[in-house]
Structures are given as structure tokens and as C-alpha cells.
Amino acid sequence: MANILRKVIENDKGELRKLEKIAKKVESYADQMASLSDRDLQGKTLEFKERYQKGETLEQLLPEAFAVVREAAKRVLGLFPYRVQIMGGIVLHNGDVPEMRTGEGKTLTATMPVYLNAIAGEGVHVITVNEYLSTRDATEMGEVYSWLGLSVGINLAAKSPAEKREAYNCDITYSTNSEVGFDYLRDNMVVRQEDMVQRPLNFALVDEVDSVLIDEARTPLIVSGAVSSETNQLYIRADMFVKTLTSVDYVIDVPTKTIGLSDSGIDKAESYFNLSNLYDIENVALTHFIDNALRANYIMLLDIDYVVSEDGEILIVDQFTGRTMEGRRFSDGLHQAIEAKEGVRIQEESKTSASITYQNMFRMYKKLAGMTGTAKTEEEEFREVYNMRIIPIPTNRPIARIDHTDLLYPTLESKFRAVVEDVKTRHAKGQPILVGTVAVETSDLISRKLVEAGIPHEVLNAKNHFKEAQIIMNAGQRGAVTIATNMAGRGTDIKLGEGVRELGGLCVIGTERHESRRIDNQLRGRSGRQGDPGESQFYLSLEDDLMRRFGSDRIKAFLDRMKLDEEDTVIKSGMLGRQVESAQKRVEGNNYDTRKQVLQYDDVMREQREIIYANRRDVITANRDLGPEIKAMIKRTIDRAVDAHARSNRKDAIDAIVTFARTSLVPEESISAKELRGLKDDQIKEKLYQRALAIYDQQLSKLRDQEAIIEFQKVLILMIVDNKWTEHIDALDQLRNAVGLRGYAQNNPVVEYQAEGFKMFQDMIGAIEFDVTRTMMKAQIHEQERERASQRATTAAPQNIQSQQSANTDDLPKVERNEACPCGSGKKFKNCHGRKSFS
């Protein structure tokens, strides 16, 4: 262990020597930059851009560019970055994390790499943990960037898409981590390119990087919507409809367990739901409900595929074990369809439309860097997950803070009495005190005790970021007492008031140890900024959460040996510190394992998400005929349908293929079993494909022009992809919950999730292509366009149109609803001029 530690220290020292060498080169430009006029210094930005365009790298520009920012900061802000800040800036440019202590000027440090990377013109995102810090930093540091000719934008949650787009198009964009993530997800849900707000993700510099990439890594960003009661009503209506069908109205393919409406079933659906054409593009969602209702009623069998529990819950039956699968639900809306079939309550769920973890969100940037005062304890995770090194940067001045040994008490009550007594003593002499707590409840408890003791104080628990910063800024004033949860006020320095240095500086009192050593170090670091005096003292009790969960038995035994009888007895021991640190390391290890597992699961989703989003973006940005892509989908759909029956009895296989063709591909009368008999599978595939291409061309010929064709193709694909992707996300969530239980059966749940998730993804792709094929072949495009033309004409001359419709209807001969329309369109009368009569 000692050898490893020595090697790490030597590596850090070697890295610092390299950084110092580059920093000295930056400093060598100081006199040259100081001699430039404002105009000449500002002109450097354009010069750097031109040099970059001609082939110079950012690394080659770094010394001079950093020197320009230093001089600009001195002229605009009156601040001149120190050498250690230059070193921190170099680390950031390299895509790593400089560990810089509180008060060492991380915000100013960031200006140098942000400016340098903005020169490339691809956008730089400065990420903060809340909107107050985004606004503050963009306003303060934005003065330097604007002075140097770069544009600065602030991305806030309340902004409109147009305002967000403007912010993202700036050279430098300030935003919170959550808003960048949500904007990414929303960009991949829009249907028009002009509705997207983000540019490709280039360089992100994350402030308080440990908070964003470590502490929040377990919580995914989710865009979801509650499933409305109207949706549940559609499940019920679809169920009521399919219960009216007879065996001639649907066709079951036994080998593949699929089902579809026959022509008579389609007629009944159009009549039941008052539709002109069931497979029009706007009816995609309805056909999904009907398909599920068909499966629920005629494929899924009670007490074989599922059971109904005593409390009315649908439970899936494992086909291999015969046991019910608690917590599992059929995906793609089938479970709700079965609930409608059995007349039990349809469980309302919020449906996830898109999700991503911060881990995978920020790994999409070309380059990622971050700043924090406490990251070394998480170095392994930063390296393994984000490929980022942690480089400790020396302080500009030596640390003068005194960190006292922890004090341990037998009970919570005795500990809190000691805390209040310490606060009272220090407050009496005017020393400012920051009391750090792990939970809001503890803050409130200590506040009540201080009120009882007559000590005025402020309570801060991260509920109001703007008020929070103001309170923290005043926490270093003489006589100030501030109670704060450990994370409250991060990003805002506590500056000492007049006369406070002589009183010992700010005293930080920790009321218990956090699970993470890093959080404790952050609390300590609120005191002693930039070489200021300060103190830190932690109070612990055997009843603290961390002590109860880890190591308390050993400490209790130690106390028993000490024969401590008094409740208020305090003990100081080196063993105590080692025990606490050991407990924290165990918790940190457990938390890292949890985050690593979250990432392993999300990596499966990531690969699939990237495929879907890339294809989706290709469709949105395409200014071309998407016919080749749709034809390829039709071809694969036909191939799958034919291959599914390759091992069936030949007669049954031909019948099933004909049924597929009639329900999903071509008009019923245009295909028969007779013409397919005697053909090999490849010949059948080719015949069906050629028939489908003819229908495809007929469909598109009904659209008015090439622009309308492209728009129709885009809407068709996007509607179906989005519907299936949303269902797939839901299915993956359910799968993840289910495979977690398999760990008890000695199976690796992540491996099973990967395997089953991949198969589900392939199935989803097949379902997308099937729905695109069926909708493309069956959509009544002519009718849709005719109605649009009618609506346009109605706007111009409503009276003439109305009279014309009446005349046309009156002049029609007596025709049965399923006969060909006499107008010559080739459609059934009910779907053409007779449609109004049967509405």
C-alpha cells in the first residue's frame, strides 16, 4: 500500500512539474499583452480564430490565449489569475479535473480554457448545479468574454425554445446540468429540425463536478407523461369492439402467436369507430390499441398466460416454471389490454418518453472537464467512468485552518448539548460559526436548541438558491451563526468580515460524519480559504446513522473497556478516526458499485438510444425522398413474414402468408393462395415485394408534389418510431426490475438484461418496420389529400362547396356499401362518395 501511495504522489508531482512549465510560458507573455491597447488585445480573438482555421491546434495557441484572458480579466474585472490558476486551467483544457481548494478562484480559472475552446467555434458549455450560479457566473465572467468578442448565453428552464436555441448558438453557454440533459432528450422528441435547440455536444466544463457526475449519477433524467384517463378509455373501447367480432373477422397465425383483422374485421372497426380508413396515418395509435385488444382476447389465455389475483391484479405466469412473476407487466400496452379484458382496474402509469443518466449524457461530449475542491477520494470512478484524471493543484497560500480531532459522545442528545455549548462559547467572543448538518431535520432540531439558548442564527437548507447565496456570503461576518445542510451554498465563497481573522476565522462545526469523506472535506473547506485562519470540529455520537450501520459495535466495546458511566463523557481517540474512515470507505465502495451497476444497465439503453436517435435525426434533417429506406423496411417485413412459416406445413404456410399479405400489404382481391403454390420462399418474397412496390408507387402518386411526399414519409416514420420507442423504454424498465430478482438464482442480472434487452430491441425494430409497411400500404392517402383540398376550397367559397356536395350525393345511383364506387376511383363505395352516408 505504501508503495502504491508513493507512486501516486510521485505521479502527481511529475504532472505538476509539466503544468508549471507551461504556466511559466503563459506568464512570459504578460508584459507583451500588457503593452497592447484595448483594441489590439480584443483583436487577438479574431487572430486566434484565423490561426486555428489555418491549422494551428488549440494546444499551440494555449500559452498566448491564456495570457490574453489574464490581461483581459485584469482590465475588466481587476483580477489577475495566479500561476496555480493557470495550472488549473491547463488541466481543464486537457479534459481532466483540477482539485482546487475552496476560495482558490475556480470560476476565474475556468475563463482561460473556456475562452481557448470557444475559439474553435463549436460551442462551450459551462455547467453549474443551479440557475443562480449560472446567472451569476455568466454575468460576471461574461464581461471578460464579451469584451474579447465572444458571445455568451444563459440557458434557463423558463426560456422558450427560440431563446434556448439562441443561447446554445452562442460561443459560450451557461446552463445547469439538468437543463442540458432535458434539452438533449427533448431535441430527440421533436418532429421538425427547426424545433431543435442544441448544437452537437462539443466541450463541457462542469463546476462542482463531483456533485454532478458522482452524487447525482444514480438519478436518471426522465421525460415522462402520465397516461391519461382517455388512454385507459381507449383500452376499454378497443376491448368492447373486439368482443363484438366473430371468428371470420380476425386471423390468427398460430406459430408466431400473431393476430390481425380480416377485411370484414376492418370494415367493422371502421364502422364502430366511425372512420373512413382504419389504416390512415392519424389512426396509428388506435390500431395499436385494437391489436393489443385482439391479442388479449384471442391469444392470451387466462390461467395459462396470466392469472387474476384476489385483489384484481393481472399476474404473468412464467411459461417455464408455472409460477407467477411478481412485479412484471407485459409490455407495449398488452398488460393494460388484458386488464380491460378482465374488467379489473387499469393501472395508470406515467409513461417514460425518454431518459438518460448524467453519466451517459456527459460522456457524449467530445471533451469533458470539471472543477471541484474535493475529488481525489473518487479518483478511480472518474478515471474508469469518464476517463478523467484528478490533478491536485497547490494552494496559492499555505492552509492555516486548524482541523481538530473528532469528539465522540454516547448519545445524540449529549452530542447536541455539546454542539450548542460550543456555539454559545464561540458566539460570545464574536467568532462566526457554520454548523453543518447531513439532513434538514437535524438543521431544524439544532435551530430549535439555539433559539432556546437565545442565540440568533440563520438556517439554510438549499430550498432557495438565491437567498442561499446571500446567507452564505454573510456567514463570515463577526458574530454570524449559520446552520446549513452540507451541500447548501456550494459555489459561493464565505469571505471573512472585519476583525474576524483575529478571532480565529470561521469555525465549521460538523454535527455528524457524512457517508462520503468528500462531503466532509467540502464542509471543512468552507473555512480557511486563500490562507485565511479557521477551524473545523466534528461532533459524533454512537447513535449517528453511520456509526449504527458501520463499526459502532467495536467502538462500543472500546467504550465498555473505558467504563464510561457519564452520558456527557467525551472521548478522543485515533482509533475512532480510523474506524470512521473505514466505515466511510465501505459506504463509498457500496455507492460506487451501485453507480457502476446503474451505468452497466444504462449502457444497454445508451447503445439502443444512440441508434434510434441517430436514425430519427437522419429522418428529421433529410431533405430527400425517404423511399429507399421505406422500401427496405417493406422488404425486411415481407422476408420476416415468409421466414416465420418456413417450417410449417406447406399449405398452412401459404395460407398464413396470404393472410399476412391481405391484412398488411395489398388489397384482398389482388393475392390468392393459388398463385403462391409451387413457388419457393425466395420467389414468394420477390412476388410480394414487387406487388408491394406497385402499391407503394400508387400511394405516393396521390400526393400533390415531392415536398408532400417527403413530409408524409417523415411523419409516417417518426410517429411509429416514437410510439414504439416509448413502449420499449417502458419494457426495459420492467425487464430491469425483473432480472434483478434473478441474482438470487445465481444468474448475472446485468448479463441477462443485456441479452434480453438486445432481443427486445430487435423485436422493436421489426415492429417498427411492420407498422410502417402496413400503414404505408393501407393508408388512404388520396382521401386525406382530397379532404385537405376540400378544406382549402371551403375557405374560399363555402356556399358553392356545400351545394356541390349535396348535388353529388343526390346524383349517386343506389350502391351497396361494399361495392365499387361508381366514380371510378377503385375504392369501395363506403370509403369514397358513400362515406358521408355511412358516417
UniProtKB/Swiss-Prot annotation:
GO biological process per UniProt: intracellular protein transmembrane transport; protein import; protein targeting; protein transport by the Sec complex
Cofactor binding annotation: May bind 1 zinc ion per subunit.
InterPro entries: Helicase_ATP-bd, Helicase_C-like, P-loop_NTPase, SEC_C_motif, SecA, SecA_CS, SecA_DEAD, SecA_motor_DEAD
GO cellular component: cell envelope Sec protein transport complex; cytosol; plasma membrane
Keyword Metal-binding recorded: yes
Entry cofactors: Zn(2+)
Keyword Translocase listed: yes
Organism encoding this protein: Streptococcus pyogenes serotype M12 (strain MGAS2096)
Catalytic activity, as annotated: ATP + H2O + cellular proteinSide 1 = ADP + phosphate + cellular proteinSide 2
Main location: membrane
Protein name listed in UniProt: Protein translocase subunit SecA
Purpose of the protein: Part of the Sec protein translocase complex. Interacts with the SecYEG preprotein conducting channel. Has a central role in coupling the hydrolysis of ATP to the transfer of proteins into and across the cell membrane, serving as an ATP-driven molecular motor driving the stepwise translocation of polypeptide chains across the membrane.
UniProt enzyme class: translocase
A single MF term (Gene Ontology): metal ion binding
Membrane-traversing stretches: none
Binding-site residues for ATP, renumbered to this chain: Q85, G103, E104, G105, K106, T107, D493
Pfam families documented for this protein: P-loop_SecA (PF21090), SEC-C (PF02810), SecA_DEAD (PF07517), SecA_PP_bind (PF01043), SecA_SW (PF07516)
Segments of skewed composition (Basic residues): 827-839
